[in-house]
């Protein structure tokens, strides 16, 4: 199994990229997966008092690494692309348990275009979306400006994704990995123009 990691910004074309990649029979690119959280919390538990009382480093490494192996055990493709926007902020976890040479694919788009895409989607859908539900729980008024502020503030989907990506650069973790940015603009160009 060769693992790659899709950590694209929301509304930046990662679903389109996934659909394109899945046309190759040797690649499986899935939707958002729980693999990161499974590995992160397993690693966290193994650093706590009970595990450290009688440490078993090799067993601990196997426990955490097995999360990604087991999650994709139903797949036969040699290239597996796990999707989670948190990966850039936790490259150390990838290096420790998956590969010394992680490859991250990140679809990117201008933040204002991301927000505009969300707002368009919300209006087109016409139902109560996850942003509106969260805002109502916090007693916020549902306006497009408030939605944008909510998504761009800490805890918001756009801010969290951009912060995870920025963390990789702040911690200088991108120097020793393959970081593949994919621009939404280039991804959506008409095929005849991009060839």
What is each stretch, according to the model?
Residues 1-75:
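PAPS-dependent sulfotransferase catalytic core
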Residues 32, 85, 109-110:
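Histidine-centered beta-alpha loop that forms part of the nucleotide-sugar donor binding/catalytic region
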Residues 61-74, 116-187:
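PAPS-dependent sulfotransferase catalytic domain
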Residues 71-90:
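Glycine-rich phosphate-binding loop used to anchor ATP phosphates in small-molecule kinases
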Residues 90-96:
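A short acidic, amphipathic alpha-helical/loop segment
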Residues 186-195:
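Single conserved hydrophobic/aromatic residue that forms the stacking wall/gate
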């Amino acid at each position: 199994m060769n693992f790659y990691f899709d950590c694209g910004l929301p509304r930046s074309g990662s679903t389109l990229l996934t659909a394109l990649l899945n046309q190759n029979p040797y690649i499986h690119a899935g939707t958002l997966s729980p693999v990161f959280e499974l590995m992160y919390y397993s690693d966290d538990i193994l650093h706590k008092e009970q595990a450290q009382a009688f440490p078993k480093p090799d067993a601990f490494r196997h426990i955490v690494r097995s999360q990604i192996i087991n999650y994709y055990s139903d797949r036969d493709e040699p290239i597996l692309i796990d999707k989670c926007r948190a990966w850039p902020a936790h490259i150390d976890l990838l290096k420790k348990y998956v590969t010394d040479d992680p490859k991250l694919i990140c679809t990117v788009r201008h933040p204002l275009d991301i927000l505009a895409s969300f707002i368009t989607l919300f209006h087109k859908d016409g139902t109560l979306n996850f942003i509106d539900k969260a805002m109502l729980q916090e007693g916020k008024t549902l306006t497009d400006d408030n939605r944008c502020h909510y998504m761009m503030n800490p805890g918001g989907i756009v801010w969290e994704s951009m912060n995870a990506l920025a963390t990789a650069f702040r911690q200088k973790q991108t120097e020793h990995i393959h970081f593949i940015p994919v621009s939404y603009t280039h991804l959506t160009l008409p095929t005849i123009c991009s060839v």
